[in-house]
Amino acid sequence: GKVGGDPGYDPLAFAIAECHKRGMECHAWMVTIPLGNRKHVAALGKESVTKKKRAICVPYKREYFLNPGHPQTKEYLMSLVREVVERYDVDGIHFDYLRYPENAPRFPDSYDYRKYSKGRSLAQWRRDNLTEIVRYIYKGVKAMKPWVKVSTCPVGKYKDTSRYPSRGWNAFHTVYQDVQGWLGEGIQDQIYPMLYFRGNHFYPFALDWQEQSNGRQIIPGLGIYFLDPSEGNWTLDEIERQMHFIRAHGLAGEAHYRV
């Protein structure tokens, strides 16, 4: 496709109609914090958010990101969500990349940290920034259409569990997602943790999500793409065991990434 081109129809309206014909729900998938590399941004020209909302955008490692620490970022994201929820009969809003870049000590938010942190550590302030975005959008969606589900796909391991360590890569510390805090506050309807692992890197963490769900739906994302010989050459029974585990322990279902 070409950026800005008119396909001659409304793709989202088409997808919703076709899903509903088949008794399926349609959730609008929205990438949140990353904006793309310089080439992607340049292709959008004056339509890029980096031009329209320069104050909330920051460059980092040859890419552009929304700055979660800027108060106007949640307003901008809510404006996008509002357009979708008001105009379309979607069943849900699903957020991807609602996180900081991985291990980003030099992410350029020092000015906002000094201005807004109020004595919190940098890590806690960043976690609070993401939580405030989640809270603000969740409440906004429910005020418009209470039946629309709000969900996120976070990093698959929340943090170390009593059963098994996360080995230094987790939602809480690596990308500042306090997802179990969101569940505890009730500001997510569903969580799709990206559990693209197997063995001890899958089962203890899937169980941890379910135990901390606060009655919300936990739907693990399974790494179906690892069945491809060029990706991981997993055997089919690996995925089958994960599916049986999910059903046996009462999780709400599974998502398949990527088919």
Name these PLM-found stretches.
Residues 179-202, 216-259:
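Substrate-binding cleft of secreted/luminal carbohydrate-active enzymes
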Residues 2-17, 27-87, 173-174:
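Active-site-adjacent "subsite" loops/lids of carbohydrate-active enzymes
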Residues 16, 20, 24-37, 94-101, ...:
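Aromatic-lined carbohydrate-recognition surfaces of secreted/lumenal glycan-active proteins
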Residues 144, 149-192, 197-208, 231:
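Substrate-binding cleft/loops of secretory-pathway carbohydrate-active enzymes
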Residues 19, 77, 84, 93-96, ...:
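Conserved, mostly hydrophobic/aromatic
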Residues 12-16, 81-85, 131-139, 179-180, ...:
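Generic structural signal for well-ordered alpha-helices
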Residues 34-50, 70, 83, 87-125:
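Active-site-proximal loop/short-helix segments
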Residues 1-9, 60-78, 119-130, 189-198, ...:
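The substrate-binding groove and active-site-proximal loops of carbohydrate-active enzymes
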